[in-house]
Amino acid sequence: MAKRTKKVGITGKYGVRYGSSLRRQVKKLEVQQHARYDCSFCGKKTVRRGAAGIWSCHSCKKTVAGGAYTVSTAAAATVRSTIRRLRDMVEA
């Protein structure tokens, strides 16, 4: 099948509505939310978004909570590193 859009991608469904800058922002989010991600349990690239914040691996059937548009958010990464640092301080 021929490629239909070059610039607009997934936001071509909105046509000329809503303005180009808003469609560009939506494109970034929609590409992230429809992408497949690596599973932290089985290592396969089969994690898909089920609903806002719910991510399921279709290989090992694990379900994890994450961000609305990506599996892991920047805030979650900060929390994980802080917990790891505090755990190391307690153990040392």
From Swiss-Prot:
| One GO term (biological process) | translation
InterPro entries in the record, alphabetically? Ribosomal_eL37/eL43, Ribosomal_eL43, Ribosomal_protein_eL43, Ribosomal_zn-bd
Q: Superkingdom, according to UniProt?
A: Eukaryota
Question: Which residues form the C4-type zinc fingers?
Answer: 39-60
Write out the entry's keywords from A to Z.
Answer: Metal-binding, Ribonucleoprotein, Ribosomal protein, Zinc, Zinc-finger
Which molecular-function annotation in GO is an example for this chain?
zinc ion binding
Name the SUPFAM superfamilies on file. Zn-binding ribosomal proteins (SSF57829)
**What GO cellular component term, any one, is given?**
extracellular region
Gene3D superfamilies in alphabetical order: 2.20.25.30
Q: Which family does this protein fall into?
A: Belongs to the eukaryotic ribosomal protein eL43 family.
Q: Which HAMAP family match?
A: Ribosomal_eL43
What is this protein identified as? Large ribosomal subunit protein eL43
List the taxonomic lineage: Eukaryota, Fungi, Dikarya, Ascomycota, Saccharomycotina
